[in-house]
Amino acid sequence: MTGWLIDMVSVGQRKPFLLQPFRGATRHLRRVSVGGLRRLQYTSLLLTRSYWGLMYAFNWWDIIDEHFVLGGAMMFDDLDRLQGLGVDAVLNLCAERSDNRHQLDNAGIAYLWLPVIDVCPPTLDQIMQGIGWIEQQLRANRTIYIHCAVGVGRSATLLACWLLYAKRMNVAQALRFLKTRRPQVGLTRLQVRRLEEFEGWLRTGRDNGIARVAGH
C-alpha cells in the first residue's frame, strides 16, 4: 500500500508513482466518454431518421441532379445503397463524426471531411476547399454524396455555395433550387449570411483561389 504513496527514485529522478494509475484511469475514462457520445449521436440520428420518414415521408437523401446526392449521415447499409445510385465520392460536413474511412477506401470512394459545428456555416476556407474538391471529382466524372448529420443545413450550405460559384445562381435561386429537390432543406440565419458573404466575395472576382484548389 505504501508503494502507491511514496515517490520512486529512478535514474536520479524522482517520479511520483501515484500518477501512473491516475493517468491510466484518465485515458480509460476518455475512451468510455467518447464511445458513449458516439452511441448517443447514433441513437439521436436513428430517431430523427425514423421521425422524418414516418411523420413527413422525408427521404434520408435526395438526388439533386446527375452529379449530386444530398442527405444525412450514413448508417447501416447506406454506403451500398448510395453506390447503387452511382455515388463514388463522399463529402462530410459533420464536426461530430467522421465516416468510416477504412470502409470508404476499400470501396474506392473518394472522401473529404470538412468538420463544421451543427447549425453553423462552413468557413470561407472550408467553402473554397470544398468547392475545389467538388470540381476535382466532377472532372473525374464522379457522383458526390454531400452530407452532414441530417442533410438540411451544413451540407446544403456548401452545395448552395457551389451553385453560386459554378452555376452563377444568386442566393435565392440556389436555395429555391435545392428546396425543389429536397424540401426539408432549411438553413440557419448564420448559414444564409455566409451564403450572402460568399456571393459578395464572388462578385469581387476573387474565386481564383478555388481554381487553385481545383487544379485548374
Predicted region positions:
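Short, intrinsically disordered low-complexity segments
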Residues: 13, 22, 29-30, 141, ...
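Cysteine-based protein phosphatase catalytic domain of the PTP/DSP
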Residues: 54-144, 164-197, 203
